[in-house]
A protein has these predicted regions:
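Bacterial Sec-dependent N-terminal signal peptides
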Residues: 1-25
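Structural preference for beta-rich elements and adjacent junctions enriched in aromatics
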Residues: 23-235
Length: 235
């Protein structure tokens, strides 16, 4: 065997981990909105209808979850990051007597769409979490997975807003979020700025709950920051 070929191959393998994080992960591009806008949870609205998102229908371990197609779209302004979830479902599992004016802790015990966003690529275990339910309930948390036990600070408040609606005839629900960027990122928003992110859903009634994610975590815990993809601010 040619020794130079062996050395060259070894160098290539050693350099692979030095590739940028975004080259090895899924990417969602958040498109630049002309201005901030009111939430409608309507994918046909002017601010959303031309936006290309990402689609997933896979479980935590990458297996297909039929009849639960999930599309995530994103746009941004210098002040806010917007997310829109389009969620196909078979059945709804909703909290009785929902509150849309106060935070609902443990909202994940019912149907939700979730966004986990981290901005420190040197501290991937610190990130923030945002949830919206089909009822329009919400909860946001500051997460730090470094301590034992991990810190899930539900008292942290981003000031984000949500809007949701259910199309029962077509078995699709829609959830929108408007998140103040300055609350989770110290950097100035600009085209090309990247964040670490993953998106999730919990849907249906136990014991038949469905767990859908954009980037599969390959275990039973959504709090797996190593699996996050990239959210990139686009034009």
């Amino acid at each position: 065997m040619n020794p130079f070929r062996v050395v060259s191959l070894t160098l290539v393998l050693l350099l692979l981990p030095l590739s940028s994080y975004s080259q090895n992960k899924g990417v969602i591009v958040s498109q630049r909105a002309k201005a901030d806008f009111a939430l409608t949870a309507d994918p046909t609205a002017a601010n959303w209808k031309a936006v290309t998102g990402v689609v997933t229908e896979i479980s935590r371990r990458g297996e297909k979850v039929s009849d639960h197609r999930t599309e995530i779209r994103s746009v941004w302004t210098p002040k806010n990051l917007y997310l829109l979830f389009i969620c196909q479902y078979e059945e709804l599992n909703l909290k009785a007597n929902p509150s849309t004016t106060t935070e609902t802790n443990k909202l994940w015990e019912w149907d939700v769409a979730e966004a986990f966003i981290g901005t420190d690529f040197n501290d991937i275990k610190h990130y923030t979490e945002y949830q919206v339910s089909p009822n329009g309930e919400w909860v946001d948390l500051d997460i730090d997975r470094k301590p034992s036990p991990a810190k899930h600070d539900v008292d942290w408040n981003s000031g984000y807003e949500v809007k949701a609606r259910v199309d029962a005839a077509n078995k699709v629900w829609y959830g929108a979020m408007r998140i103040p960027i300055a609350k989770f990122d110290k950097r100035k928003p600009k085209v090309g700025l990247e964040m670490r992110a993953n998106f999730y859903r919990i849907q249906g009634t136990p014991p038949n709950r469905k767990f859908i994610n954009w980037q599969p975590v390959n275990n039973d815990n959504y709090h797996t920051p190593e699996a996050f993809g990239i959210l990139r601010l686009g034009k």
